[in-house]
């Protein structure tokens, strides 16, 4: 039996270890998700980053449980992340949403549960529509609830105490929101997940968060690539990072692919990454992004690519002012 690669981990402030490289479940097709997760586990992946909003947690759970049943991996060797969607921020709905996730995954607990966005949509019952996405109970119209983030956070803290979640964290939060949340929290966020690629580097946010003892996971590591199939005009009008001369020249120098350079750029700075791939060779390549180091010149040249270009901005949904 072939040995699976050893993946470095980040020690979280909750005491747990989170793998530095994982498999992202966003936009993984329901028809193929179970097999993709199972094959990723066989390849050596241990971190799986999912969410209620992705609509594929049942299938992700099937892949996980098949691998556990076959003895490929033990549950405690996996690190499973999910995220609380915007319609479930009211404290009375938080556990209901988590229970739905646990039921779909067919697991007793998740390793990490994040607030997906600092946005409280109007509650939609699970039996009415799940996942609700942008549905707020009234066609295409957005409706909101007056739920402070700290109230949602306190509900998550109770679920840590109940043993249903090992670590709690946040996603798509700005420095000011984190600064405020920490002052009211009993349990500090273990992880911040953010959009992170050379076109959107956010160095001050990263410096603040890492100094505060909060680990960072970057999503959309390949920049516009993730958003092309969504027909995002911003992505379609942006040069792909895979073809960018700076990235290509660094890749050629190290004998690596542009994707590996983009992932190593993050992991070398202790930022976890969660790429996905259907291709077995790329799956393995994405996992082996800690066996080489970028030089200071490489890092300096990539730093010059930052133009503050964000592809995932709720302002585009309904003028929601998270990042204004």
From Swiss-Prot:
The keyword Oxidoreductase applies. GO terms for molecular function: D-xylose reductase (NADPH) activity. Pfam families: Aldo_ket_red. The keyword Transferase does not apply. It catalyses: xylitol + NAD(+) = D-xylose + NADH + H(+); xylitol + NADP(+) = D-xylose + NADPH + H(+). SUPFAM superfamilies: NAD(P)-linked oxidoreductase. Keywords: Carbohydrate metabolism, NADP, Oxidoreductase, Xylose metabolism. GO terms for biological process: D-xylose catabolic process. Signal peptide: none annotated. The active site is at 54 (proton donor). The record marks 83 as: Lowers pKa of active site Tyr. Reduces D-xylose into xylitol. Preferentially utilizes NADPH as a cosubstrate. This is NADPH-dependent D-xylose reductase II,III. The gene is xyrB.
């Amino acid at each position: 039996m072939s040995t699976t690669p050893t993946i470095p981990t980040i020690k979280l402030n909750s005491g747990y270890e989170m793998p530095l490289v994982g498999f992202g479940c966003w936009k993984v097709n329901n028809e193929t998700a179970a097999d993709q997760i199972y094959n990723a586990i066989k390849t050596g992946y241990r971190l799986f980053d999912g969410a209620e909003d992705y609509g594929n947690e049942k299938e992700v759970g099937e892949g996980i449980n098949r691998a556990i049943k076959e003895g490929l991996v033990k549950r405690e060797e996996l690190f499973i992340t999910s995220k609380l969607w915007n319609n479930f921020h009211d404290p009375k709905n938080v556990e209901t949403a988590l229970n739905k996730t646990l039921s779909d995954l067919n697991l007793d607990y998740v390793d990490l549960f994040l607030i997906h966005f600092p946005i409280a949509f109007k509650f939609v019952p699970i039996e009415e529509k799940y996942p609700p996405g942008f549905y707020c109970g009234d066609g295409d119209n957005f409706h909101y609830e007056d739920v402070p983030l700290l109230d949602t956070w306190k509900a998550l803290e109770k679920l840590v105490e109940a043993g249903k979640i090992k670590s709690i964290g946040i996603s798509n939060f700005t420095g000011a929101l984190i600064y405020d949340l920490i002052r009211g929290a009993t349990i500090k966020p273990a992880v911040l997940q953010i959009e992170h690629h050379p076109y959107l580097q956010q160095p001050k946010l990263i410096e603040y968060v890492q100094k505060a003892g909060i680990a960072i996971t970057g999503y959309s590591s390949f920049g516009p690539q993730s958003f092309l199939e969504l027909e995002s005009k911003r992505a379609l009008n942006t040069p792909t990072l895979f073809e960018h001369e700076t990235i290509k020249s660094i890749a050629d120098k190290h004998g690596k692919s542009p994707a590996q350079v983009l992932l190593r750029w993050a992991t070398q700075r202790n930022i976890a990454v969660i790429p996905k791939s259907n291709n077995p060779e790329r799956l393995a390549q994405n996992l082996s992004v800690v066996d080489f180091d970028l030089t200071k010149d490489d890092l300096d040249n990539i730093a010059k690519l930052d133009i503050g270009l964000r592809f995932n901005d709720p302002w585009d949904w309904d003028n929601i002012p998270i990042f204004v």
